[in-house]
Amino acid sequence: MNLDYFKILFFKLTLERFPNIFRPTSSPYISGDGFRKISDHIFDESCTLDPNKINFNDIVFLNPELADIYFSNFHNQVSNKYYLVTHNSNIEIGKYIEKYIDEKIIHWFALNLDLNHPKATLIPYGLENLRRLRYGRKEWFKSKKFLKSENYVLASFDIFKNYDEREPILEILKNNKLVKFNKFSSKREYFYNLKSFKFLICPIGQGYDTSRIWEGLLCGVYPILKLNEHSKILKEIGLPAIYLEDWNDLNNYDKQAFNDFYTKFKNTKEFNINSFTHWKEKFKLLKSNY
């Protein structure tokens, strides 16, 4: 093994041990650490906050793994109304919104949103945080030249991230000639090949949302999603994707159907929910107009 390997290994181990050392955004792309960066206060595995310093209209970033601690010990000490952002966790957030939202929270922006609430808005997973130095590296998305071949649907996922949900997909679609089940030896190989497909199967993993959805869109590849409480919201807000009641339904689509979907999605106006600039401007507007 060469010296560079050990340098990278040391760097990764250091980042895991000291999570506040390296927290870059993925701008111009979305990531959890991007939302974290544009917040006024942070309460997560590496930062705490002073509730007395939360001013009217401020944005608080919360890792929902710590939601019970935050709401039991900090939120009740806040005297001003504020915006809440929850990200960087696989937790289904609906139960916490129902339990904790009150008049002090002007609006709650949430990853893995799984209910409709007038004071809650879905925010995307986006890319894996850049600090992981894996799938979220910006170099994978710089090229906008997508050379589409006769590859229609890619299925490339780790079934052990959610075995009960993902393993049946292999059996259901194993004879579908338009679906390619591929494993890749590196991230570079994955993204190079991904760009040649039109659609990407995106089953839920450890949480409802997954970086796979947003990586695919940045590569000109549209997600195929099974309907659930989270993906129903994505459908409502107009995310270009094929939505299925059951994975078996995918076996009813032929090449013409996929081509029709692909043409329709390509001709749809740009979907700004996948733009970090959109969210920065939205938050800036909220803070100035409330």
What does each model-found stretch correspond to?
Residues 2-214, 222-239, 261-287:
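Nucleotide-sugar donor-binding catalytic core of glycosyltransferases
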Residues 217:
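Short alpha-helix at the nucleotide-sugar/activated-sugar donor binding site of glycosyltransferases
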